[in-house]
Amino acid sequence: LKRTRAAVEVIREHRQDKRVTALVIGALGRCGRGAIDCLVKSGVQLDDVARWDLQETSAKSGPYQEIVDSDLFINCIYLSKKIPPFVDAALLQQAGSNRRLGTIVDVSCDTTNPHNPIPIYSVNTTFERPTVGVPGVDGLEVISIDHLPTLLPRESSEAFSHDLLPSLLQLPYIQNDEHALDALQKEHAEGQGAVWARAEKLFQHHMADAVAHGA
């Protein structure tokens, strides 16, 4: 954290307004909240962190000028469908020397997804080599480690277990009642196995899609 705070201060010293600005997309999720907490602990003022989620990204279509106008961009979304890119090569070229953006942290790491909202790089990075440059763009680095939770294994395991355990405890409710899934889908009885109802519905949807395509 000391190195990170030092890096933030270096950025601050080179800014006329003496601010280090960041934009977090997916700010209301677990990763987004963690990113904001990390930024603040690293010396970025909370007021200088733009916190976007579905409301902001739905209000207008990307690419977003606000990204290139920020020092740091952190992508924490869960990508479930095709969306316009958050930032692309054209936006970066248009910004030119006026670009403030210097670092992108792509927590989502959708590099192999055809709907990748950050289509300016194509490789994942590692703890040993955490950054990769953006082709054709000077002074812009991307962190795209697709197993970031392993950096904090205990904390990650505890957080995941905390969220998973309630659903595991609901499983007997489903296993002991063959009509429970149908009932839960109608009643949305969260806390009585509804997560398994949604999982069953999603499985059946994709199974039907696979059969339709000859799988």
Residue ranges with predicted function:
Residues K18-T21, D47, L101-V105, L140:
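Residue-level recognition of the N-termini of beta-strands and the immediately preceding loop/turn
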Residues R5, R15-K18, V44, I83, ...:
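Extended interaction regions within the primary functional domain
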Residues L1-Y78:
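Glycine-rich phosphate/diphosphate-binding loop of Rossmann-like nucleotide-binding domains
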Residues L1-A6, T103, C109-A215:
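Adenosine-phosphate binding glycine-rich loop
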Residues Q55-D138:
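Rossmann-like adenosine-cofactor binding region
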Residues R30-G32, K81, T112, T150:
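Short, acidic Gly/Pro/Ser/Thr-rich loop/turn segments
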Residues G26, R30, G34, V68, ...:
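Conserved active-site and cofactor/substrate-binding residues in soluble primary-metabolism enzymes
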